[in-house]
Amino acid sequence: RESASENEITKHYLLENSEKYGVKQSQNLYPVMNEKNILNEKIRISRELEKLKKIKQKELTKKQQNTYMILMDYLKRQKNLSMYPYYERILGKTSGQQVQILLTLSEYRLKNEKDIKSYFRLLQGLDGYFNSLIQYSKEQVKRNLFISDQSLRGVLQQIQSVIKRNKNNILVATFNLRMAEIKGINASQKKRYCRKNKKLVRTKVIPAYEKLYSHLQALKGNGQNKNGLYYYKNGKEYYKALVA
């Protein structure tokens, strides 16, 4: 329940009718990547591990024991990774957060007007999410953990391609298709929603990408390591935790 309520994106992905499970409205639209949240996540993982350790395995069924072992293994991995909070590669030409969020939004479940309004809030809040990516990247620069210029060029090229395709953005095309499949909303209202989506992409999404591009371009020259995660300070230990 705690994981599902962390942000709107996660809640919507995990639960279709979150109210039935007692999950309240999320305060955050997106995952927040800042020092406070990183610390809170460390604390949460430690607490979950302590709770799990108190469970008597002998009293569990075979199926429950399997679930227990999987969860224990997962939490231990996450605890190890939490020791390296600024090593994560959040930016990438094909797998970075700036790419993944477009795919997530383009596949956002739309079954009713509540879902549509939630989706619109996410478009309006994209700039805030990108601000957290910018701040995270600046923290990586301070710690000499920022991506190389070669990798950054790929990221900037991808962002530029999104900006250039502002009129035929993936969020416009996929939204129109999903709207056509929704039942219980009349045709005129669907058209209004499609127009609003197009406007939000133009006035909120594209400017958010333009701002991200500008800030990341300013960080060019700060990536000291061209040889991968292993070659950062403590990179060997981080890589072991990552692939364990």
Tell me what each language-model feature is.
Residues R1-A244:
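N-terminal maturation segment of proteins
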